Amino acid sequence: MISIFMRKIFAFLFLTIGVLACTPQDPPLEEETNPEEEIPAPDPEPEPEPEPEPLPVFETSFEAITNMGVGWNLGNTLEPVWTGDTDGRDWRRWETGWGQSVTTQSLMNMMKNAGFGAIRVPVSWGVHMDTDGKVYEEWMNRVNEVVDYVLNVGMYCIINIHHDTGADEELAWLVASPEGYARERQKYENLWKQIALRFRDYGPRLLFESYNEMLDEGRSWCFASYSLGYDAGVASGAYQAINDYAQSFVDVVRATGGNNAVRNLVVNTYGACNGAGDWNSHLQDPLKNMKMPKDEVEDHILFQVHSYPKIDDLAAMEREVTQMLDDLETYLVSQGGPVIVGEWGTFSENPSLENYCHYARWFVSECKRRGIGTFHWMNLSDGMYRSVPCFSSPEIAEAIVKGYHGDGFTPVIPVIEDFDIDYKVTYRDLWSELNLTSSSVDLREYQGITFELDQAPAEGQLHVKVYGDEDGKEQYGKFSGVSATISFDPSVLGDEAKRITLQLLQEGGLTITVKNVHLIRKDGTLEPCTPSPFWGCSVEIVTRR
């Protein structure tokens, strides 16, 4: 009886437990919500990073050397740093301050037609900046205009920072020393930023050059610390500073973007020194210590040096230049950048025209063969000849372009004799002088000088000044009317007239037109002369209609 009862209880308990185990659990209570409250939208999917814009496609530095052809320097034009003027905005006075005519599109057309393919435009900036380092807009606009003249005819153009470097302790604010770099780095980088932004959209035919001939604190030429008797520590610091300036230049230009991201850039050795010669063991140090700047793009940096060998002994010149070119290949080209000789000419005094033409033709041809670019320093169309325009040294110009293009090339070389001309002279200052002759005059062969103006000056405005063969020997000639003849007095001057000028005697400047100038030989025959600026004036050749 009990056992049956107990079995029923156990069975009931077992059944109850089983039912409870199989009964589903109540769901958890939901949080109360406000039906009017908006449910936040899920976070948006992150947008993919935009693809970087492709860099412009520019020719490499080596291709630029080939494509630019042979070059010339528009010297003493946009780089004057002392002219007696203080207003850095007045570009015309600065551009003509060192005796050159105002640059024109016609001049660049002439250079192109003669066979030149590139123009280096030296530019000074420090005298054209305000106290905050901002370039005056008037000056930047003029630089831009001259650059456009070059590019308009399909030539290449190089612009730089020029006489902000060099030997002038007062005006050359860029110095190759660690202290100089630390002191002027911000101003230097800010200047290049302004230039780069102005020209960032220009194409591959515009190149930037970092600095011209930067020297150490001792203003040493040839190699760093030369003027100090050589101090290895000073020299090392100077070469490091050159590399630092070059790196700053590349970094700043690249950061401005646009076409500047791949523009071909030129960096110069210390002092633009080329390592030529064997008279000192340190001569090659500027080449050995020059480093290729780090760059975001490959093959868009060129090196630059300058070269002015003596050419009285042509065989010696060729040996020296050949060794120089070998060294440029060894120390610079081997780093992955081509070389341009951004200035070349000669330090020989009064070299023969025959020697100069031989040198010019050989130098350009040999550099071309080696893939080295060349830019002759001035001395082809200078001073008033640019205003025609025509060549002042036509034989040298022809030698240069034939050295590059070959003897079969026929250049267009206009000369002054092709034109009927007058000379427009602008005097700026009291005592300014115009050269009436281009060289000294032997008084044993010549008896006087005669000239004609377009109109008579006022009495006392001008006189002729003749410099004798010694200091203090001077003859003065007064005149009135549109023409004058001055007879030389050997008892006053001696055997030679070193210089003959037309001098201004009034304040406030004056503009005159000289129609012709002739020396009078002892036999009475006339020899034409070409007037030119001596100081304080400019000359523009005006072609007669």
Walk through the language-model features, giving the residues of each.
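Aromatic-rich peripheral "rim/lid" segments of glycoside hydrolase catalytic domains that contact
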Residues: 351-418
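Extracellular glycoside hydrolase catalytic/binding regions
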Residues: 91-96, 100, 190-193, 197-205, ...
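Active-site mouth of glycoside hydrolases
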Residues: 56-276
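Bacterial Sec-dependent N-terminal signal peptides
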Residues: 19-55
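N-terminal low-complexity, Pro/Thr/Ser-rich intrinsically disordered segments
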Residues: 40-67, 416-423
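Extracellular ligand-binding interfaces
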Residues: 416-496, 505-541
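Short, solvent-exposed loop/turn segments at secondary-structure junctions
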Residues: 77-79, 126, 164, 213-215, ...
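Sec-dependent bacterial lipoprotein signal peptides
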Residues: 1-20
